[in-house]
Every structure is written in structure tokens, then in C-alpha cells.
Amino acid sequence: RVVRNQTMLAAMHSPGGEAEVALENVRVPAGNLILGEGRGFEIAQGRLGPGRIHHCMRSIGQAQRSLELMARRADTRVAFGKRLADQSSIRQDIAKSWYEIEMARLLTLKAADAMDRVGNRAAKDYIAAIKCVAPQMAQTVTDRAMQVFGGMGLSDDTPVARFFSLNRFLRLADGPDEVHLSQLGKLKVSEYSKSNAAG
């Protein structure tokens, strides 16, 4: 049964928001089981890698769109007698946004390639990295775009505020950044400790 519908970050991402569901006395007929009893988490884990690639590509696209809007706004907006694009700090924010998007894009492509070549389990370090990098990068870029737009950047007149909140949500979806970073750090300590012992 649906306990309640909730919105996340004051936005409705699906009709009625995100539902809190209570499963009580639920039985699945044996013929409807996939893989077998008790293996649902295994199925979910197998889908997380491709799902994370998908979300990261969306984050990159949202950051790219925000960068384009920010650059156009900086080119046309005049404040205190100067175009925003003539301000060094604005140009630096645009440059940083561009290279941060490109870095996240390349890391995401590398993760997808690793998943294709060696499988999700062996590519887990790249998957964990992009899960943290892409939404954080998109949130940073969209924040810069909101700054360039001023109050308009917080409104529905541009998509950047929505992109900001979606990427904040993604930093918690499928586990908080901190959990992924902790696991990635543990993996790398183990990996480098073994390679140092061997060489």
C-alpha cells in the first residue's frame, strides 16, 4: 500500500512525487521469481552500474546546457557598464565549467568502456568514481550559472535551478557520495598495497 507521496527538494519528479510504500504479507508465486528466492538484491546490483552511467550522462548534459546558457547570458548581460563576459572571474568560471564537464565526460566514457570490456564488478572503481564526480560537477556548474543569471537563475525562467536540485538528489540516490568515496578509498588502498608489496 502507498503510505504517502512525498516531494524531494520541493519538486515532484514523478506524478505525485516519490511514494513511500509498505509491503505487508506479500507473497510472490515461485513461477514469478527471477533468478530465485533471496536473489533480488543481486539483480538490483547488476542494474546499478548501467543506471549510474545513464544518470551521469544526464548530469553531464545538464551541466553542458547550463554552461551554454551561462555563456550566452554573460555575453548579453551588462552590469555596471560592462558585459559580464568582460569580467575575468566570469570568464574563469566559464572556462572551469568547460574543463570540468570534459573531465567528467571522459571519466564516464572510461567507466562505460570498462563495463563493456571487463564487466560491472571489475569496473566498480570507475562506476563509484563517476557516481560521485558527475553530479558534483553538474551541481557546481549549475551553481555558477545561477550566479551569472542572478535572481532569474533561481526561477523557472531557466532550467538551471532544476538541474541544480536534480543533481543534489543524485548525490544521495543509490547511496550518498561519502559511502562511495569510502568504498573507493578502501579499494584503492588494497589495490596499491598489493602492488607495492609485489614490487
Language-model features: where?
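Conserved catalytic-core motifs characterized by acidic clusters
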Residues: 7, 32-48, 73-87, 147-162
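Short alpha-helical scaffolding segments that buttress acidic/His motifs in well-ordered protein cores
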Residues: 44, 111, 164-167
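FAD-binding core of flavoproteins
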Residues: 1-68, 72, 177-199
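Alpha-helical transition-metal enzyme core signature, strongest for iron centers
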Residues: 60, 64-67, 94-108, 131-142, ...
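C-terminal helix-coil-helix/basic helical segment that borders enzyme active sites and/or dimer interfaces
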Residues: 71-85, 101-133, 146-153
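Alpha-helical membrane and juxtamembrane elements of multi-pass inner-membrane transport
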Residues: 42, 88-95, 121-124, 128, ...
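Alpha-helix capping/hinge segments and adjacent helical runs
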Residues: 121, 128-199
